[in-house]
């Protein structure tokens, strides 16, 4: 008797829970559930994803937005020092007077920042779009994806080369825009001589690399289009017999030197060329 009473009490207590989950009627609750979650191609999709991931899944607009890398504490301190240096540079009257002059390479703007640039403490990059009216700029990073521009002087003509396409000369005509994203300048002291595309930001910015050759105003500086190291060939001053192998090689070398000293009018000078001795065979 008591067992049946307990079952009755539990059934009465569970009735509101079942009604709240499945609706007051089976058919109405089924239709209401489909109308709430499955009407339309994307209706209720975020709710399903949120439930499946335990509330850890980001919203669709947050997933589609570009990734912003948070700087480490060391980089934050370095960026703070760079910002302080930039503010001091902008407040300097000499920089304000010389930033658009022809003597920018020897001005205070270059000397204050060139040391950090050469030591790799500041990343120098170009804008996202490159055209013929591009100004040579120092972009000081205020964050991984944000930079402040210090425009200095015009950068005349550039040649843009993209793999699979002929080089595009950007020096006249209407403004020509070339995507170069992001572009890293390689720096010699006070001279920007080449820029190349290096994808360092983990976002789908550009799949095809674009290499840009930059000309210094009034002077063409040869630099490879692709970031490769060309081999250095050194021409020897004169050809001489290579080191002999064993006693036969030493004997042939001595015989060649003696014949050269006897037969040539140049006296004791070394012979210009001698045939190498075969392995283990006398000279022929």
UniProtKB/Swiss-Prot annotation:
Keywords attached to this entry: Secreted, Signal
Biased composition annotated in UniProt, kind: Low complexity: 244-268
Spans annotated as Disordered: 240-284
Record's GO cellular component terms: egg chorion; extracellular region
Compartments (UniProt record): Secreted
Chief localisation class: secreted
Molecular function GO labels: structural constituent of egg chorion
GO biological process, one term: egg chorion assembly
Signal peptide: 1-20
InterPro entries, alphabetized: Chorion_S36/S28
KW Lipid biosynthesis (keyword) present: no
Protein's UniProt keywords contain Signal: yes
Domain of life according to the entry: Eukaryota
Function (record text): Chorion membrane (egg shell) protein; plays a role in protecting the egg from the environment.
Family per similarity comment: Belongs to the chorion protein S36 family.
Entry protein name: Chorion protein S36
Organism: Drosophila melanogaster (Fruit fly)
Gene assigned in the entry: Cp36
């Amino acid at each position: 008797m008591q067992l049946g009473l307990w079952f009755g009490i539990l059934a009465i207590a569970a009735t509101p829970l079942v009604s709240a989950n499945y609706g007051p009627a089976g058919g109405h609750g089924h239709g209401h559930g489909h109308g709430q979650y499955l009407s339309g191609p994307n209706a209720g999709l975020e709710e399903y994803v949120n439930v499946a991931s335990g509330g850890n899944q980001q919203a669709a607009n947050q997933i589609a937005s570009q990734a912003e890398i948070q700087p480490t504490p060391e980089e934050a301190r370095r960026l703070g020092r760079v910002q302080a240096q930039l503010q001091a540079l902008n407040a300097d009257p000499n920089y304000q007077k010389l930033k658009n002059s022809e003597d920018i390479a020897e001005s205070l703007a270059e000397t204050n920042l060139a040391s950090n640039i050469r030591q790799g403490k500041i990343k120098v990059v170009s804008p996202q779009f490159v055209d013929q009216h591009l100004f040579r700029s120092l972009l000081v990073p205020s964050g991984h994806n944000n930079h402040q521009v210090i425009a200095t002087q015009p950068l005349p003509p550039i040649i843009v080369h993209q793999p699979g396409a002929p080089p595009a000369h950007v020096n006249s005509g209407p403004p020509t825009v070339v995507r170069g994203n992001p572009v890293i300048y390689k720096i010699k002291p006070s001279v920007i001589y080449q820029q190349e595309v290096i994808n360092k930001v983990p976002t789908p910015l550009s799949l095809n690399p674009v290499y840009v050759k930059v000309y210094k105003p009034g002077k063409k500086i040869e630099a490879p289009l692709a970031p490769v190291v060309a081999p250095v060939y050194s021409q020897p001053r004169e050809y001489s017999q290579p080191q002999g192998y064993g006693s036969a090689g030493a004997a042939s070398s001595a015989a060649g030197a003696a014949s050269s000293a006897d037969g040539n009018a140049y006296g004791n000078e070394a012979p210009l060329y001698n045939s190498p001795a075969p392995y283990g065979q006398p000279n022929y």
